[in-house]
Amino acid sequence: GKIKGLKVVGIAGGSEKCRYVVEELGFDACVDHKSDTFADDLAKVCDKGIDIYFENVGGKVFDAVMPLLNARARIPVCGLIAGYNATDLPEGPDRFALLPRMLLTKRIRMQGFIVFDDFGDRHAEFFSAMVP
């Protein structure tokens, strides 16, 4: 993202991990998903909305991201770690009904992918493009 001039915001658990994301990885900002004010903090940092969201978590993180997605946003889905060990539906309100409506009205593209299906043989190319 930063290579293309985009604002890049990370989400991590704890202040030390957020410090690492900003200072070592070079992200513009990082929001602590363990904070009681996580959704508000994310909204403040993403004050112009979100155009690209790499979904790898799901759960309350995706719940906080959903209202911030801009029209024509793109969401590559690589994982949903918040639900990997789930054996039942998650507690709380069912937000799934909102997702198709949001995808339609905001014309958002959401696509799942397994990295090794298409890109496993291009790891070296990706690494050289992403690591300065």
Model-based region annotation:
Residues 3-64:
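Adenosine-nucleotide cofactor-binding segment
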Residues 4, 60-132:
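Glycine-rich phosphate-binding loop and adjacent beta-alpha segment
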